[in-house]
């Protein structure tokens, strides 16, 4: 890669040509899509972050051709809107989704937005280059980039994305909050990312920088054309005489002489006195963001950089293994499946990007083994053997919690055991953690709940002893499969099948009644449709839309291939499957479990948010689940809408979502979806009234629409959602932890639905000392409480290790209020750990700044927020080390 500090004039002709071809003129900007405030045409932090990431990703694809695929040509993108779905389909092939990339980029963008929303961050001038804290801001910026590198090298990519979001926010704020653009600069500051380089010509304490401005727009209020300064915001720190304010409606300092301000956050003079320079500031901020991404790519290398942004359609492979003496067959089955996956997928687009292994053997569990090297994973797995013992129950949920802590989002976790959990008290917390991590958990249990033989037992066990597994599987969108030793190797084949990125098709009705038919829809964008059934099944029939039926006879039938392994059945339909309504009928003792899955290029992400119209940066406040008493916005982003699909078959249109009670499947309501912005984005929104949702009833989301030819389209999110009774926020320090340190944490809890008497419990993994000044909260309607926690990191803490802090708010006594959890992930960094950014990176790949002021629009730029400009009002999910609420996120 060329040195990041090399000016554009030093870039070679081929690179300049590349830049000219990729970047369209400014007129191609997408406008703001939310009309919460009047700032049309503003460019947001999310816009800048995602456009820069797409530019650098495309350059990586151009420079590193995929083996076996046609080389991408930059000319193919001349004059076109750059879409993540398009470049992924071109690079990996049709049918390979950009979903993981978009989800990872969403993590970065939400962490970016957190800097403007969270109380611990939004008022700190060092994090925003405010109050002439330019040197301190640069220290924070460089520190966040270093921490991004450290976390990525420790394979903690979630934390790395959070620190990257914080770094990009500060970097982008520099160009909006300082007067760099007013000084006539149109390129990024050449020294801002290099800590040993001086920031020249800084305004000093006694230097007046602004004149008084009475109006909203203040184009000529800068006094000196050579000194670098930034504006003061609010009353802390107080603005000295003669200094500039940030400005805008919510800045109290802007009413004190000299009045006005210099921020370029938006196109609205109500919020940005230098609004006329907004686009110029955005253009330079985009160049700087591309420079930062390119720097990380050069430091990490292409493989690790791709993992940082999840530039892959593949998931991770995560095993939780019971290693007691009776588990020999199960361990061998796990080894066989892991070996098969490694051998079949190595070097392909679906090669797992990450491998996680957690053994458990009562009374212990762990340690966790994580690697990105398949050979190392196989070697470690091959060392595991059944260790003797065999008392039931086991510490399964503790091991699963450890796996969830280290498994990347949007992954499958497979638990092999023949015992019930000894640590069933962790059930609710693990359920919540699966939602927070968006991981699907499948239990393969070689134990019949009614069987009495087998392991030794310390006491008589309840027939409901496996219910914790059922609850966790249901909450995560997974399943519990009971089988026997002789079938485990065949049943374990679902490990590889599930990792193919399958979607679950909605059934009507969702819960099977023996003897009653159940239907599901197949559309032309589905393939490898598979029906899985397990239970005491005596017979079944599957009927296609053409009226062709297939029964339980094993082998290849008129519809597909039927296989049976004890009480576990699979029917894989012959491709291409007939489109239309299919019917299943099952005869069984008890309630059979039926699941229909398929591969598809069309899927969706969804998130929640609430409107916030006060504060310095109004917008949509991100939530991971609805909150009781609050009007919630549901935001849907359809993935897999490539340009080719739109031209050939017409663009799919989704009209509404259906909310169903879980697990009964009864319909709670149907909510219309409204398109937001241009159709090319596939962005839809709906308002969920508080009366529609209940704290006591989890619900599922089903997306309903039509394809280009009028066929029915239905997609369902596998993880059910729940409504939080209170808003619970947990935030940590802006920096990483170090051994021997004591870190302050902040807790905030609010009730919007009425009186709440809550007990607050805390836990830490690993078991570090944690103290809190808030153990109970009695809240009335719209009342809040604040708490302070102190986390002590021992001198013996392992560097590059993850610490997870959990706070649980539960109703007191016999209260029926379900608990709400907040999770905070932190990284312990050795005091000597440094990844210096002391000089430019040297590599063969080009940086991708434009030769003319412009931004590259993309489908990922879906969050234009009115009135915020670059204020970072992304509207969904977990942000910057903080989980607002544990609950429903997209699968």
From Swiss-Prot:
CC terms in the record's Gene Ontology section: extracellular region
Q: What is this protein called?
A: von Willebrand factor A domain-containing protein 7
Q: Which residues form the VWFA domain?
A: 314-499
For this protein, the record's InterPro entries field holds: GBD_Hemicentin/VWA7, HMCN1-like_VWA, VWA7, VWA7_N, vWFA_dom_sf
Tissues where the protein occurs: Expressed at low level in many tissues.
Q: Where in the cell does this protein reside? A: Secreted
- Region annotation (Disordered) maps to 238-273
Tell me the first and last residues of the signal peptide.
Answer: 1-28
Any Pfam family hit: VWA7_4
Q: Sites of glycosylation? A: 55
| Extra remark | Recombinatorial hotspot within the class III region.
Q: Which UniProt keywords apply?
A: Glycoprotein, Secreted, Signal
Going by the entry's taxonomy, the superkingdom of the source organism is recorded as Eukaryota
């Amino acid at each position: 890669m060329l040195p990041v500090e090399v000016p554009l004039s030093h870039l070679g002709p081929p690179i300049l040509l590349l830049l000219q071809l990729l970047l369209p003129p400014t007129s191609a900007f997408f406008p703001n899509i939310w009309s919460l405030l009047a700032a049309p045409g503003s460019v947001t932090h999310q816009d800048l972050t995602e456009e820069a990431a797409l530019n650098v990703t495309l350059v990586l694809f151009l420079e590193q051709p995929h083996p076996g695929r046609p080389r991408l040509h930059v000319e193919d993108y001349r004059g076109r809107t750059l879409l993540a779905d398009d470049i992924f389909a071109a690079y990996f092939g049709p049918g390979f989704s950009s979903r993981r990339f978009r989800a990872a980029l969403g993590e970065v963008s939400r962490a970016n937005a957190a800097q403007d929303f969270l109380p611990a961050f939004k008022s700190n001038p060092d994090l925003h280059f405010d109050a002439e804290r330019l040197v301190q801001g640069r220290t924070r910026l460089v520190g966040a980039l270093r921490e991004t590198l450290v976390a990525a090298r420790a394979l903690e990519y979630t934390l790395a994305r959070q620190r990257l979001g914080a770094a990009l926010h500060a970097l982008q704020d520099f160009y909006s909050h300082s007067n760099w653009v007013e000084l006539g600069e149109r390129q990024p500051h050449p020294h801002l990312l290099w800590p040993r380089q001086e920031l020249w010509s800084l305004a000093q304490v006694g230097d007046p920088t602004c004149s008084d401005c009475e109006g909203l727009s203040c184009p000529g209020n800068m006094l000196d054309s050579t000194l670098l300064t930034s504006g003061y915001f609010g009353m802390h720190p107080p603005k000295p005489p003669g200094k500039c304010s940030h400005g805008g409606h919510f800045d109290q300092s802007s009413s004190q002489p000299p009045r006005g301000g210099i921020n370029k956050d938006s196109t609205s003079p109500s919020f940005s006195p230098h609004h006329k320079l907004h686009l110029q500031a955005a253009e330079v901020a985009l160049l700087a963001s591309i420079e930062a991404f390119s720097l990380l790519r050069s430091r990490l290398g292409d493989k690790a950089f791709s993992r940082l942004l999840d530039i892959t359609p593949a998931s991770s492979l995560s095993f939780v293994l019971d290693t007691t003496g009776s588990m020999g067959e199960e361990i061998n089955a796990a080894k066989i499946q892991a070996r098969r996956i490694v051998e079949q997928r190595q070097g392909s687009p679906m090669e797992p990007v990450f491998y996680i292994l957690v053994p458990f053997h009562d009374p212990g569990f762990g340690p966790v083994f994580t690697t990105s090297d398949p050979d190392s994973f196989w070697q470690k797995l091959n060392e595991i053997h059944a260790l003797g013992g065999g008392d039931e129950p086991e510490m399964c949920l503790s091991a699963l919690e450890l796996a969830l802590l280290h498994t990347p989002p949007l992954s499958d976790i497979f638990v092999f055991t023949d015992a019930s959990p000894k640590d069933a008290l962790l059930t609710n917390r693990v359920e919540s953690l699966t939602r927070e991590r968006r991981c699907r958990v499948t239990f393969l249990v070689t134990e019949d709940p009614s069987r009495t033989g087998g392991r030794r037992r310390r006491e008589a066990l309840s027939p409901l002893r496996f219910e914790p597994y059922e609850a966790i599987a249901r909450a995560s969108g997974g399943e519990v499969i009971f089988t026997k030793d002789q079938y485990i190797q065949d049943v374990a084949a679902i490990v590889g099948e599930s990792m193919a990125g399958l979607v679950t098709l909605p059934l009507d009705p969702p819960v099977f009644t023996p003897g009653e038919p159940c239907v599901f829809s197949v559309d032309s964008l589905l393939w490898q449709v598979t029906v899985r059934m397990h239970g005491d099944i005596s017979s079944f029939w599957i009927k296609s839309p053409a009226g062709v039926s297939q029964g339980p006879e094993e082998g290849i039938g008129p519809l597909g291939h039927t296989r049976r392994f004890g009480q576990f059945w699979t029917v894989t339909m012959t491709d291409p499957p007939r489109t239309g309504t299919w019917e299943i009928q099952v005869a069984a003792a008890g309630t059979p479990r039926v699941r229909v899955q398929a591969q598809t290029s069309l899927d969706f992400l969804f998130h929640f948010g609430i409107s916030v119209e006060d504060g310095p940066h109004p917008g949509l406040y991100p939530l991971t689940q609805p909150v009781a008493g609050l009007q919630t916005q549901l935001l849907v982003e359809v993935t897999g809408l490539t340009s080719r699909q739109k031209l050939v078959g017409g663009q799919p249109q989704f009209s509404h979502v259906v909310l169903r009670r879980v697990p009964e499947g009864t319909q709670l309501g149907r909510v219309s979806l409204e398109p937001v912005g241009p159709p090319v984005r596939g962005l839809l929104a709906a308002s969920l009234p508080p009366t529609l949702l209940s704290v006591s009833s989890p619900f599922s989301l089903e997306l309903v629409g039509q394809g280009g030819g009028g066929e029915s389209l239905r997609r369902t999110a596998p993880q059910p959602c729940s409504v939080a009774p209170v808003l619970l926020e947990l935030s940590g320090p802006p920096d990483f932890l170090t051994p021997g340190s004591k870190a302050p944490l902040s807790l905030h809890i609010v009730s919007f639905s009425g009186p709440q008497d809550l007990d607050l419990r805390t836990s830490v993994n690993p078991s570090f000392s944690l103290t809190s000044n808030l153990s109970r909260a009695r809240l009335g309607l719209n009342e809040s409480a604040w708490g302070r926690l102190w986390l002590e990191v021992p001198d013996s803490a392992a560097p590059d290790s993850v610490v997870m802090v959990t706070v649980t708010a539960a109703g007191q006594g016999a209260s029926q209020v379900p608990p709400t959890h907040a999770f905070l992930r932190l990284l312990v960094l050795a005091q000597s750990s440094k990844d210096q950014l002391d000089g430019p990176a040297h590599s063969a790949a080009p940086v991708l700044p434009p030769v003319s002021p412009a931004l590259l629009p993309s489908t990922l730029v879906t969050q234009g927020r009115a009135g915020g400009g670059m204020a970072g009002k992304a509207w969904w999910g977990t942000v910057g080390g903080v989980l607002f609420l544990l609950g429903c996120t997209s699968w």
